């Protein structure tokens, strides 16, 4: 491991000052489940590491005026056990349960999973399907943007070296919205997704309303499928239209073939998981 400087500020303002002072050779440390592994293999020192794991401003899950706020340093285990998540967005519990092993979920944070920005991340699709927003602070102040705008490419977000992700907010209008997440990997546990998917929707008079479909591991970043969504809007619920939406979703994705799965196999998974998430969300809607 290469030598580096270590800073542990007392608050958010101290973090921003430290990031600005040491930019661009600076990295943020929260759970460290990805970065500490990476750090052992880098060819040069990262410069300065800024520890934010202890900051209470980045913790907590609470209802706010705009919706449900989840601090960026909240762990996956905390998400799985929190009553507000169970009440408003239970699909997040299912997604969090598929992330890594128990130790990874105990240490790894929601913000870290998003910032790492691996296309196969399991936290992304559910949040994208629920139109989540993220809050970023930096020397110039704060900004709130859609999560879909946060992702730029594999392991690349819009965060500047002197900026910090502080929370994720699920809009109030989507709290309690029937949502489902499904993942397919090579193993039942501790597996990267070959494809993962989430769908959210309302059912009004037996018809689809406000459908959102999101896919992971099928493009450089987690994506929405607006054409598949539009194909369902306002239509009576039937397996025929759900199957057609799955076929349309395939055309909106850009999967690759690699040693884990061929392009053709991933296309099949896109269609299947789109159908499964839609049907699961419908089932949730019918039970509510």
Predicted regions and their residues:
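C-terminal structural segment of proteins
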Residues: 1-288
């Amino acid at each position: 491991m290469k030598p580096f400087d270590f800073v542990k500020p007392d608050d958010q303002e101290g973090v921003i000052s430290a990031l600005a002072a040491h930019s661009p050779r600076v990295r943020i440390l929260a759970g460290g489940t990805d970065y500490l592994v990476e750090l052992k293999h880098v060819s040069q020192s990262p410069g300065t590491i800024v520890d934010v794991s202890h900051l209470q401003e980045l913790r907590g899950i609470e209802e706010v005026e705009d919706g449900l706020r989840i601090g960026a340093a909240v762990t996956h285990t905390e998400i799985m056990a929190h009553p507000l998540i169970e009440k408003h967005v239970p699909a997040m519990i299912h997604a969090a349960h598929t992330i890594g092993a128990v130790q990874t979920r105990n240490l790894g944070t929601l913000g870290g999973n998003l910032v790492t920005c691996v296309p196969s991340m399991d936290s992304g699709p559910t949040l994208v399907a629920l139109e989540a927003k993220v809050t970023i602070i930096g020397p110039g102040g704060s900004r709130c943007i859609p999560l879909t705008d946060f992702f730029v490419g594999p392991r690349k977000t819009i965060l500047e070296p002197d900026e910090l992700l502080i929370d994720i907010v699920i809009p109030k209008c989507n709290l309690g919205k029937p949502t489902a997440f499904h993942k397919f990997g090579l193993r039942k546990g501790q597996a990267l997704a070959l494809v993962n998917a989430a769908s959210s929707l309302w059912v009004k008079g037996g018809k689809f309303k406000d459908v959102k479909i999101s896919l992971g591991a099928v493009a450089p970043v987690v994506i929405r499928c607006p054409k598949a969504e539009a194909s369902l809007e306002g239509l009576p619920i039937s397996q025929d239209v759900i199957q057609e939406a799955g076929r349309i979703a395939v055309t909106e994705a850009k999967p690759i073939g690699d040693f884990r799965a061929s392009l053709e196999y991933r296309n099949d998974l896109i269609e299947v998981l789109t159908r499964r998430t839609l049907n699961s969300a419908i089932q949730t809607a019918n039970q509510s």
